[in-house]
């Protein structure tokens, strides 16, 4: 159960990082 929550949190965190990186890249382009 705890491993499942950690896995989902890691997925959400990576998605946020990628989306913010793409947003900054498009904004500065």
UniProtKB/Swiss-Prot annotation:
InterPro entries: PmrR. It is found in: Cell inner membrane. Keywords: Cell inner membrane, Cell membrane, Membrane, Transmembrane, Transmembrane helix. It is a single-pass membrane protein. GO terms for molecular function: enzyme inhibitor activity. The keyword Acetylation does not apply. One of its GO terms (cellular component) is plasma membrane. The chain crosses the membrane at residues 5-27. May bind to BasS and modulate its sensor kinase activity. This is Putative membrane protein PmrR.
